[in-house]
């Protein structure tokens, strides 16, 4: 029977499959360096079982050093395939190689222990088979023993004394057979040995008071897990005499060699102490040992039967081999130092060090009744060993308040701390890089003060009650009033009883203590502090005219009477679908009269508004698989390509088109809106690559890279064909006729980018989009929307919500600005002075949508969850404001005046388009 390294799964052992550790180290590929950044990975195929390594960023010399455990047989052929992973097309095969496991085992004497193999990678193309590089792999953890040799004729009779009874085995079927010896507690090992091997001392047993006992606890304990099987060692069976009775373990040569496991040295005492050590197998004792006064090691003795199996001529020379056991009493063999153990550190409690028949040191954990090859070390500081309710051992790290199944060592803890330190350094460097345009904290105190710097010779202090006062070092006096609020040095003094003060927004006003009144007019010259200075910026848009024209078309085509819609709140979606699809499209232009079953409400407009809100929340819910979120960082919707799983999906999209058209026709708003590219498709406008960034940033960046780089120099092999996966099914699509055979070059890559952009917006949703637009056009002709753009259509459909300025200010955070910074004061002044449409445009510019969550500004969502509206100080006063819709952040440069801030903000809101990356 073939044996190999121990495995945790005993079912594979019985089925003949063994575990092999395959370490894919590295590869050297004969290919040009790829600047596109493809990832390389290796695929290992073993009898239909496929395992893959991680992806390596190196395109010519990838390194993995990844260990894969596979189930093999001695006749298995390992197949290695090296692949190049691409984002825009299918993975490309770079080369493959095979390993005949049977041939490798024969080459390395049926033992694979860290065997390094250099495999030649090859690839078949139109020119034949070409060499594409080399792959380095390491095979480990597999040992195959010799096949059984049956030869009963040469086996002498064997007598085993057990409880005073003699058991004979001489090939006679009538005789009793020798019982099997237990190994590893579960798998029995045949007690026969081939003609070329003998039983090692790990299988020895002793007779104590006539009872047959194992020679060591290791016969019951399990062998160390994940360790290769020890080689068979030829040594003699031992015979110990206890209380006048002897026992011996002899082997027949008619069976195979079993799996051996490490065991402690066999010792026995009979008024004499004997310590045993490992000796080289099958070696004659020195001549001086025959007259030694001490009993030699039992493991060093070789019996006549075992000796004859190895060397037939050795019988005459070793007739007195058992006489060595009977030595004078009182002799003690001196303890021999174990050369293999140089570590003098004490073992933890409950651990024991032992040696197997090969002289290898292993360790026994009596706490868990397990063995291991690695020397146990005490737990690092702050760690604790515990056992859960199911008896499993785990370890608690009180330093980080975490748990793990793996026993920690000082080295593993040190490696983790080193990795954590490197990660913190990298994060610090990235933070410094991201803040390269920001101002230092020392500059913020003076610039954020709305009153500016103090006059020369003045100092601002705080007393013990945290009250601010000012010191005039010129006159050596103090005062509570801020000298900057009492007029400038070149201004005329205020009249008697007047004082200058400032509002929270930083606007100056005057207090007349004589009449106890306040005013914004300066009593010295009559000028108002709130007068709008500078040229007025024209702000005119035709949206109101467009909306009025659309409302006129709707009213002109409205039909008399009304149409009843009777629905239940529990089955709102299905009831509405059945009733709307049962009506004629022109009947949906009548005034709506909505009835909720079981409720007595009369619809004078309020129930219809609620019906539109609730139904839009239902039909656009991504859980129905009809729509999906357009991106990871927003909650706008687009058609889901996987909606085809519903056999009636086209009818539902036609219903949704009618419903959206009804909302526009009757002037109602829906709960959730679509993405801007979807609105452009409704308006029959051409979609550009800029529109792609808001829904698929990774795809957009890939196309931009192709546009800005020379793909021929990078060696990219792209064709006018693309693959798409929907519900696990991969389909191929040609961007143009015969595109799978047309190579993308520098001359035609612009056409390729345009076709890829068009395909990305329409992939898998052509029929759904057509059904939606057909249903929409039945109620509201699409020609009525030709004057609007996509942003105006979103405002019409989702509504222009009245913004709560107090809620907006209360849920706004500032970075490198404070609430009292003059730029922040000017910003909120600008928001208050503009109308609701400009506020919606500003909100859409910063957050990507003009709609707010149900909880207002406090529940604005960003890329990583809730993200409040943020204003950050970035750049110079000549820059335009920038927005980060993923984080709801506005980059507001430090403008010098309110007029400059207002001009830049309006220009950014109205005239800018698209996204960019810093």
Swiss-Prot record:
Enzyme class: transferase
Annotated EC: 2.3.2.26
Residue ranges annotated for the C2 domain, each copy included: 1-116
Start and end residues of each stretch annotated as Disordered: 150-182, 209-360
PROSITE patterns: C2, HECT, WW_DOMAIN_1, WW_DOMAIN_2
Region (Required for interaction with and ubiquitination of AMOTL2. Required for interaction with YAP1): 345-527
HECT domain mapped to chain residues: 584-918
Topology in the lipid bilayer: Peripheral membrane protein
Biased composition (Polar residues): 150-164, 209-219, 235-258
GO cellular component: anchoring junction; cytosol; nucleus; plasma membrane
Marked site: Required for ubiquitin-thioester formation: 886
Location in the cell: Cytoplasm; Cell membrane; Nucleus; Cell junction
Pathway per the UniProt entry: Protein modification; protein ubiquitination
Interaction with ERBB4, as annotated region: 345-525
Pfam families per UniProt: C2, HECT, WW
Cytoplasm keyword on record: yes
Post-translational modification: Auto-ubiquitinated and ubiquitinated by RNF11.
Reaction(s) the record says it catalyses: S-ubiquitinyl-[E2 ubiquitin-conjugating enzyme]-L-cysteine + [acceptor protein]-L-lysine = [E2 ubiquitin-conjugating enzyme]-L-cysteine + N(6)-ubiquitinyl-[acceptor protein]-L-lysine
Biased composition regions of type Low complexity, renumbered to the chain: 266-281
Subunit structure: Interacts with the Crumbs complex components PALS1 and PATJ; interaction with the Crumbs complex is enhanced by WWP1's interaction with AMOTL2 and facilitates WWP1 localization to the plasma membrane. Interaction with the Crumbs complex promotes WWP1 monoubiquitination of AMOTL2, which activates the Hippo signaling pathway. Binds SCNN1A, SCNN1B, SCNN1G, WBP1, WBP2, DRPLA and adenovirus type 2 PIII. Interacts with TGIF. Binds KLF2 AND HIVEP3. Interacts with RNF11. Interacts with SPART. Interacts with NDFIP1 and NDFIP2; this interaction activates the E3 ubiquitin-protein ligase.
Alphabetized PANTHER family for the sequence: HECT DOMAIN UBIQUITIN-PROTEIN LIGASE, NEDD4-LIKE E3 UBIQUITIN-PROTEIN LIGASE WWP1
Protein name: NEDD4-like E3 ubiquitin-protein ligase WWP1
Organism: Mus musculus (Mouse)
Gene name linked to the record: Wwp1
